[in-house]
Amino acid sequence: MRCPSCHHSGTRVLESRPVEEGRSIRRRRECEQCHYRFTTFERIEEPPLIVVKKEGTREEFSREKILRGLIKACEKRPVALEELEKVTQEIERELRNQGVSEVKSETIGEMVMERLSHIDEVAYVRFASVYRQFKDINVFIEELKELIKKGQR
């Protein structure tokens, strides 16, 4: 493993532990030359999961893309990064457990919105406004009414 700081090829593992319910291993490493410390993850290589976009194009599933969307929606909100990473893992696990090779982007968006509605309502509305592409204030108000109804149940 090359050091991301000085690119020296000699590193040593300081600590290893299973994460994601044993589906991957987190390793803390240290460069033998510059002593820079960094983290790596070792995961099982799974068959590719293809996302079918609204316009019909296809791209490989990206857990990082989901996490970026969650982080953006939760910007300046009291939501821990660990919680967003957990949501991302849950969504990926649920999709892979379905045993399909393709999934619609709408399915992923709905899964994200469902989980965000339980974590932070402001983040939910932010994500929904981008995901659902609200055309005017009335559509936005209807979404807020639905959120309020769900909260009263």
From Swiss-Prot:
Binds 1 zinc ion. Pfam families: ATP-cone (PF03477), Zn_ribbon_NrdR (PF22811). Keywords: ATP-binding, DNA-binding, Metal-binding, Nucleotide-binding, Repressor, Transcription, Transcription regulation, Zinc, Zinc-finger. Its cofactor is Zn(2+). InterPro entries: ATP-cone_dom, NrdR-like_N, RNR_NrdR-like. Transmembrane segments: none annotated. A zinc finger (unnamed) spans 3-34. Residues 49-139 form the ATP-cone domain. GO terms for molecular function: ATP binding; DNA binding; zinc ion binding. GO terms for biological process: negative regulation of DNA-templated transcription. The keyword Coiled coil does not apply. Negatively regulates transcription of bacterial ribonucleotide reductase nrd genes and operons by binding to NrdR-boxes. HAMAP family: NrdR. Belongs to the NrdR family. This is Transcriptional repressor NrdR. The lineage of its organism: Bacteria, Bacillati, Bacillota, Bacilli, Bacillales.
